[in-house]
Amino acid sequence: KNISFVNIRVAHEIRGVADKILPELYKAGRFQNTLIVSPPGFGKTTLLRDLIRQLSDGNAYGPGLRVGVVDERSELAGSYRGRPQNDLGMRTDVLDACPKALGMLLLLRSMSPQVIAVDELGEEQDLRVLHMAASGGCSLLATVHGAGEEDAARRLGGEYMREMFARIVILIG
């Protein structure tokens, strides 16, 4: 077969990209379940990466939290030989190249995270495990593809999405 093009994406961190929205994600010093929505290429993963770091290290709005990250496609941590190449914070545990639903279950059962962070929700199985995590007192931080809240609601189930996420951040260009 002939190759018609090659697309190489290089994950990199941009520190401080979450600074402006961070205060909106807390209520009375507690991080609120947050969903980030945007079309591809708008910076969801970059924003997620910086939010994970700031939640883990602590910030002006709350103390550092234990964050569990399921990095299914190795985009968040950029792990190489088991070591994250991007800074996700000092209290972050990363499960690299692990399916989201399985990784979230492993984190819940063995790592006692205060926050679970995942990129690109979509599978029904992911949503079931997220619901289980939220029911167990774990905070959620996730992204989903969509042009806005309506698209995200169609993908995740509108009532379910609004019940699960107290904050919905929509990135527009």
Residue ranges of model-derived segments:
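The conserved Walker
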Residues: 40-41
